[in-house]
Amino acid sequence: MNSFWLRLRERLINFYPPLLGAGIRSRTIDDLTIHVEMKLTALNRNIVGVHFGGSLYAMCDPWFMLIMMRALGPDYIVWDKAARIKFVSPGHGTVKAVFQIPQERVNEIRAVADRGEKIEPTFSVDVWGEQGQVIAHVEKLLYVRKK
């Protein structure tokens, strides 16, 4: 899949119902970085008036996989395999996260996959509140191999 179609898919993902309903918006900065934010609304507020944990997780779900798919190209299989979220403090207002994979890490993963091996890299991201406090820490485990 060429770059145009990947970028179009990334723009259209903002209209995917679970993301749209939670008010999650993404913005691609470059090939290896995506900024995501979510405003607190009646649709993503929990019973105590802060961000619902499921929405915080949904905010972090697809991005590392999408970055890795774009970085490696169509000759590789990339799947989300597992995730873990640790809630650190209540989220009020708009929360944000920056998903980034360094080019050196992409090169390391590609080298392992090119040897015919599967690789299961782990990535982490913090979700930040408006005052700069950490709201949640998320770890994602991917599965990567050459087709």
Model regions and ranges:
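Non-catalytic linker/capping segments at the edges of enzyme domains
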Residues: M1-E37, P74
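HotDog/MaoC-like acyl-thioester-processing domains
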Residues: P102-K147
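A structural signal for short, well-ordered beta-strand segments
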Residues: V36, A83-F87, A97-F99, F123-V125, ...
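A generic structural signal for short beta-strands and their flanking turns/coil linkers
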Residues: A22, L32-I34, W79-A83, G93-A97, ...
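Hot-dog-fold acyl-thioester-processing enzymes
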Residues: L43-W63, I77
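A short, structured loop/turn motif at beta-sheet edges
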Residues: I29-T33, V88-T94, W128-Q133
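Short structured motifs
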Residues: L20-R25, K81-F87, E108-R110
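Hydrophobic beta-strand-centered segment that forms part of the acyl-chain substrate-binding groove
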Residues: I67-E104
